[in-house]
Regions:
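Formylglycine-dependent sulfatase
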Residues: 2-4, 17-173
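Sec-dependent N-terminal signal peptides
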Residues: 4-14
């Protein structure tokens, strides 16, 4: 009887201890052309950014970042690919970007993540590696902008930051 009890106890302990962790959520926010003191999480008082501060406190706050290419589209290509501009081929804001190359979103998809890109991308072509995309073609407009939503052009009434925030939150839900 003791052997049976020990066997059953071992069985429940073994199967009760299985790994049940889920991968962490990743929210990557990239902003253009702001000074280091524009986000209050970095300890400067220029702007109060309580929501970004909360995200930084609960997640990660990068305090030592280095830019390999500080030009708009090339910097995005570097972020997507992890490769210097002279390797990923996007060295200026004019030439096309090769979406066929590997990027971090494609890698995240291979391990089960759902991926989305919302906002200004400034890379020609349709984003690849994303389950959902709502991007501004080119520079975009601040009011009543056209978006490419999963490749379909749609004009949305309103201010671009408000629209981008809403599209992002709708997808996250």
């Amino acid at each position: 009887m003791k052997k049976l009890f020990f066997l059953l106890l071992s069985f429940f302990i073994f199967f009760g201890c299985q790994k049940t962790t889920t991968p962490p959520n990743i929210l990557f926010i990239m902003s253009d052309d702001h000074a280091y003191q524009a986000i209050s999480a970095y300890g400067h008082g220029l702007n109060e950014t309580p929501n970004i501060d909360r995200i930084a406190k609960e997640g990660a706050l990068f305090k030592k970042g280095f830019v390999t290419n500080s030009i708009c589209a090339p910097s995005r290509a570097v972020m997507l690919t992890g490769k210097h501009s002279f390797i990923n081929g996007k060295v200026d804001n004019i030439q096309d970007y090769n979406w066929d190359q590997d990027n971090f979103a494609k890698q995240l998809q291979t391990v089960g993540y759902q991926t989305a890109m919302v906002g200004k991308i400034h890379l020609r072509g349709l984003p690849q590696g994303f389950d959902y995309s709502a991007v501004l073609p080119g520079q975009g407009h601040y009011y009543n902008p056209d978006f490419l939503i999963d490749g379909i052009k749609k004009r949305i009434e309103g201010y671009v930051t408000t629209i981008t925030t809403k599209l992002s939150l709708d997808w996250l839900k």
